[in-house]
Amino acid sequence: MASPSQDQIKVLEQSRQRLVQLTRSLGSLIGSLNQSDPLPSWSSLQSQASIISNNLLSVSEHLSDNCDLLSALVAYPGPEYPGRTQASTLEQLLRTKLDPRIEDWVARGRRAGASALEDKDALSETELAELWDWAPVEANQEARRRNWGGDYTLEEREMGIQNVVTGLRRQLEDDERDEDEDEDDEEEEEGEGEDEEMEVVGVRRRSDAGAGLGFDTAVPTPASSQQVQKGAGPVVPLDDVLRFMTTGTLPQQR
């Protein structure tokens, strides 16, 4: 066989570089798992797995693109190769059969690929592309229809929680009671806000033709608010409150 051309040598060099990158990324993952105590964080493992996946994809694409060349090339030692001192490396280079474990992986992959090609009911590439375009939008809409933070789904609430076999019914009733209390608190706050907007300062009998009482109102001023605050009890410093909570010592009278 003739000597390989420069283009063929370039393909072999690219194959070597990709395999070296894959080997290093796998070695880095194995080393981090064996040496780290505790184990690496999930984000670190996910990052390393992503790097390995990209390296595998790069090697697979390169081997597929140059399958004809790599299948036709034959390795043989030259006269200057140190066969006595590098016998183990020479055996690996001249090995024509895969490792038994690798042969099993290759056989399973080929069987899976053949069964996928024989499946006539499988989706075509166009149908798969349409499915991937439809799935994210539909999944997002379905997620928005769900009540992820509650004890029951929206469908179970619509059908009635008394018909649900499983679930924390008592917790749900407490949740509903809490919601009612929150609504009452909001109404009270709104009522207090309205009271603050208009304050009754006097009552008198109406002088017009209608019977009844009349009310004199006024908008509260900052001065009146300060007077109300002055009428309240003394303010306890935060340090005294913390001291009382931790040691039980009563705050000093001021």
UniProtKB/Swiss-Prot annotation:
Location in the cell: Nucleus
Gene3D superfamilies from the UniProt entry: 1.20.58.1710, 6.10.250.2610
GO terms, biological process: regulation of transcription by RNA polymerase II
Coiled-coil zones: 154-190
Region (Disordered): 167-234
Keyword Aminoacyl-tRNA synthetase among UniProt keywords: no
GO CC annotations, alphabetized: core mediator complex; mediator complex
Positions with biased composition (Acidic residues): 173-199
Main location: nucleus
Organism domain of life: Eukaryota
Any one Gene Ontology molecular-function term assigned to this protein's record: RNA polymerase II cis-regulatory region sequence-specific DNA binding
Alphabetic keyword roster: Activator, Coiled coil, Nucleus, Transcription, Transcription regulation
Self-association and partners: Component of the Mediator complex.
Role according to the record: Component of the Mediator complex, a coactivator involved in the regulated transcription of nearly all RNA polymerase II-dependent genes. Mediator functions as a bridge to convey information from gene-specific regulatory proteins to the basal RNA polymerase II transcription machinery. Mediator is recruited to promoters by direct interactions with regulatory proteins and serves as a scaffold for the assembly of a functional preinitiation complex with RNA polymerase II and the general transcription factors.
Family: Belongs to the Mediator complex subunit 8 family.
Protein name: Mediator of RNA polymerase II transcription subunit 8
Origin species: Aspergillus clavatus (strain ATCC 1007 / CBS 513.65 / DSM 816 / NCTC 3887 / NRRL 1 / QM 1276 / 107)
Gene label: med8
